[in-house]
Amino acid sequence: MIRGVGIDSVEVERMKKIVEKGDKFAKRVLTPKEFEQYQQLKGKRKVEYLGGRFSLKESFSKAMGTGLGKYVGFQDIETLWDDLGHPVMTSTKFSGNIFPSITHDDHEIITVVVLEELN
């Protein structure tokens, strides 16, 4: 049964300015494993990665119906690449199936997260 669907978007230019300021925002938003992947990237790909992970976490919290804050925090949600480069999302706050989707162009990063409860 579908528990929730969350959608979010982030402007690439906004995220580029954040990345240019240093790693403070990235360290707050990304889990240690995500940050490790992030540090391996450069330029545009680094901006897309941070913006994508931020947006996916926003989408997840919207699908949960809580938003980010008291119940769900950035460190409770992790999205890593599988062997084929697909995003695989896990969370300490949800035990069902999580289906993340991410797309981006030169201007916008858009994410969708579908949560499926297991019976």
From Swiss-Prot:
GO terms for cellular component: cytoplasm. GO terms for molecular function: holo-[acyl-carrier-protein] synthase activity; magnesium ion binding. Its EC number is 2.7.8.7. It is an enzyme of class 2 (transferase). GO terms for biological process: fatty acid biosynthetic process. Disulfide bonds: none annotated. Mg(2+) binds at D8, E58. Gene3D superfamilies: 4'-phosphopantetheinyl transferase domain. NCBIfam families: acpS (TIGR00516), pantethn_trn (TIGR00556). Transfers the 4'-phosphopantetheine moiety from coenzyme A to a Ser of acyl-carrier-protein. This is Holo-[acyl-carrier-protein] synthase. It comes from Lactobacillus johnsonii (strain CNCM I-12250 / La1 / NCC 533).
